[in-house]
Design a protein with these regions (language model features):
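Gram-negative bacterial Sec-dependent N-terminal signal peptides
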Residues: 1-21
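Acidic (Asp/Glu) and glycine-rich low-complexity loops/linkers
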Residues: 21-174, 179-191, 199-201, 243, ...
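Short, surface-exposed interaction patches in beta-rich subdomains
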Residues: 198-297
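Conserved G/P- and acidic residue-centered "switch" motifs that form tight phosphate/ATP-binding loops
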Residues: 176, 194, 251
Length: 297
């Protein structure tokens, strides 16, 4: 099982993406109130397979429920008061030294149990169709391996995730303190709400929304680019080409576009700054506050 974990993590290397594939909705996996490691193995299949190794920690046994094609996994760490959900028992999440290998060296404090090393936590192996759809909450650290036609990942906790190169579209939503690493993709839509960061390889069309102090960094873009920041988070695009670059900032967040843009439209309300290395088309700007727009290297 350790070999499976290592091979899936290694698949995050930013190699060239394969030819685009048409994405169709796939069955969904929801993981909640859990401390766990997850490995998603992508296969030619229509259903979802789940294998669990409980590990050596004193965490509750994971419960797996099926609702049609969808799968729900409950880690048993949810708290209720008078029948009302009060969050979970997870505190003080610490990531490992290498976020390309989520869970290695990580630990988390669990109420009434103490500190749990992720290497002792349950290991969930998910065998998924090529259109991957995962929602995770709690302290769930996971990798999604190669071969996906599309990936939809929602990370609403403190765990880190790594997504290997994807043939088609990637949608990565982050709410909490965890980080997400994304390989190459045909298009990328990412929503960062909280203190976590998203780091991605080359993509085509890009849509980024940041609300909070989290950051998004993309190696390369080749397509329409839409960036929205509400808060102090930053967006960095290292290089690439975008026929239309649309930026909206409300707050102190900054945008650094290191490629070549065609038409550029910037709206700033606050102290945010926008730098575009090169613009070949029309540049429009609306600034209220101390923000600034700079074109040129």
């Amino acid at each position: 099982m350790k070999a499976i974990l290592l091979s899936a993590a290694a698949a995050v290397a930013f190699a060239a993406a394969a030819a685009p594939a048409l994405a169709k909705p796939g069955p969904e996996v929801e993981i909640e109130h859990a401390v766990a490691r997850v490995v998603v193995i992508v296969e030619d299949r229509a259903d979802i397979g789940v294998e669990i190794e409980q590990g050596s920690s004193r965490l509750p046994a994971l419960r797996v429920e099926r609702d049609g094609a969808n799968v729900r996994i409950d880690g048993g760490l949810g708290r209720r008061l008078a029948g009302i959900r009060m969050g979970d028992s997870i505190e003080d999440c610490r990531s490992g030294p290498d976020n390309t290998r989520p869970g290695q060296g990580a630990s988390v404090e669990v109420r009434d149990i103490g500190r749990v090393n992720l290497e002792d936590a349950p290991l969930i192996v998910i065998r998924a169709p090529r259109n991957v759809d995962i929602d995770a909450g709690g302290a769930v650290f996971g990798t999604i391996g190669r071969g996906a036609a599309s990936v939809k990942l929602g990370n609403a906790g403190c765990g880190d995730w790594a997504i290997a190169n994807t043939d088609g579209a990637v949608t990565a939503s982050l709410a909490g303190s965890g980080d997400i690493i994304v390989g190459t993709s045909r298009s990328l839509e990412t929503d960062v709400a909280g203190a976590g960061d998203v780091t991605a390889g080359a993509t085509g069309r890009l849509e980024v929304s940041v609300a909070g102090s989290g950051n998004a960094t993309v190696a390369e873009v080749n397509g329409e680019t839409d960036i929205s920041i509400a808060g102090a988070g930053d967006v960095i695009i290292r290089r690439g080409r975008s026929p239309n670059l649309d930026v909206s900032i409300a707050g102190a967040g900054d945008v650094d576009f290191g490629g070549v843009a065609g038409d550029v439209s910037v709206s700033i309300a606050g102290a945010g700054d926008v730098r575009v290395a090169e613009a070949t088309g029309r540049v429009s700007r609306s600034i209220v506050g101390a923000g600034d727009v700079r074109i040129g290297r």
